[in-house]
Amino acid sequence: MTMENKPAGQNGLTYAQAGVDIDAGNLMVEKIKPLVRSTRRPGADGEIGGFGGLFDLKAAGFKDPVLVAANDGVGTKLKIAIDADIHDTVGIDLVAMCVNDLVVQGAEPLFFLDYYATGKLSPDQGVAIVSGIAEGCRQAGCALIGGETAEMPGMYRDGDYDLAGFAVGAAERDRLLPRGDIAEGDIILGLASSGVHSNGFSLVRRIVELSGLGWKSQAPFQPGATLGEALLTPTRIYVKPLLAAIRACDGIKALAHITGGGFPDNIPRVLPKGLAAEIDLPAIAVPPVFSWLAKTGNVEPNEMLRTFNCGIGMIAVVNPAKVDEVIAALAAEGEKVVTLGRMTRREKDGVIYKGQLAL
């Protein structure tokens, strides 16, 4: 229809009328620029807003680097954040899920990008999310160099959103993990988790539903916090302590990030075919949240171990002669470390449990 024959009083449709507010997106970008600047590190000192993020690998000081990449999300933990209207911690989870997967390969996280998709963009909600992402990047020592904010009416309900993260790191070629000398008798150390982290939340939400509690209810397992606040405790980022321990002593042979699938699905991923991890379950100090979930949902111990981290967010396989040095290096960085078991010859399963989990 030409301008000449358009009916009088009829206005053309706009993108905003279709549900996409470009001005809101631009406002959010301006608000997050200081957050992005706070994550600068050697190799990344540019501004966001270009068509791509830049990183100078030479400035990061590597000599013979291998790039390592990972991407992940936060899963249905986001549903709790949305329903509880708490959005400033899930960004930490997003970074943690990616960078913890880098450090288990011996890599130092260098930069991070995020993808934030929503039905209707709220700049304040978006800024809260990015503030968490920036905090996660600072904890991991990586730069937030870009991202994508997608307002998609019709794809998501107003207020709903999803997140995805992308991290790239680097390791010197001769420092990659797992090492090839993992042997029977090597010691298994466990690093404490901060809580549920970012896996198993479909089961968590079902258990909360059965309990009859709401997200604003007092958390039965954490005095002084609501259930939403307690369950949204951010995933622990292990990057700086593990890199410090790797660099301080040549003792860590392998690392495993305990995510979905728990011990039985994650530990064997870093082990040679002929070896298994023997885990002393009574050595694990199980946080109260897991005991509450198990009892309230009547969840069997083996199901707990295959769904949740149960208090151990990271596993390290260590040279027996270096165990004390590794524990000291990790403790100096604030990590709670427990000796969990040892490597043994594999007969069937990649993980062998000894004793019972104290749920």
UniProtKB/Swiss-Prot annotation:
GO molecular function: ATP binding; phosphoribosylamine-glycine ligase activity; phosphoribosylformylglycinamidine cyclo-ligase activity
EC numbers on record: 6.3.3.1
Gene3D superfamilies reported for this sequence: PurM-like C-terminal domain, PurM-like, N-terminal domain
GO biological process: 'de novo' IMP biosynthetic process; adenine biosynthetic process
One matching Pfam family: AIRS_C
Gene Ontology, cellular component aspect: cytosol
Metabolic or biological pathway: Purine metabolism; IMP biosynthesis via de novo pathway; 5-amino-1-(5-phospho-D-ribosyl)imidazole from N(2)-formyl-N(1)-(5-phospho-D-ribosyl)glycinamide: step 2/2
Keywords for the protein's UniProt record, in alphabetical order: ATP-binding, Cytoplasm, Ligase, Nucleotide-binding, Purine biosynthesis
Subcellular location: Cytoplasm
Principal location: cytoplasm
Coiled coil: none
Reactions listed under catalytic activity: 2-formamido-N(1)-(5-O-phospho-beta-D-ribosyl)acetamidine + ATP = 5-amino-1-(5-phospho-beta-D-ribosyl)imidazole + ADP + phosphate + H(+)
PANTHER family noted in UniProt: TRIFUNCTIONAL PURINE BIOSYNTHETIC PROTEIN ADENOSINE-3, TRIFUNCTIONAL PURINE BIOSYNTHETIC PROTEIN ADENOSINE-3-RELATED
Protein family membership: Belongs to the AIR synthase family.
Protein's name according to its UniProt entry: Phosphoribosylformylglycinamidine cyclo-ligase
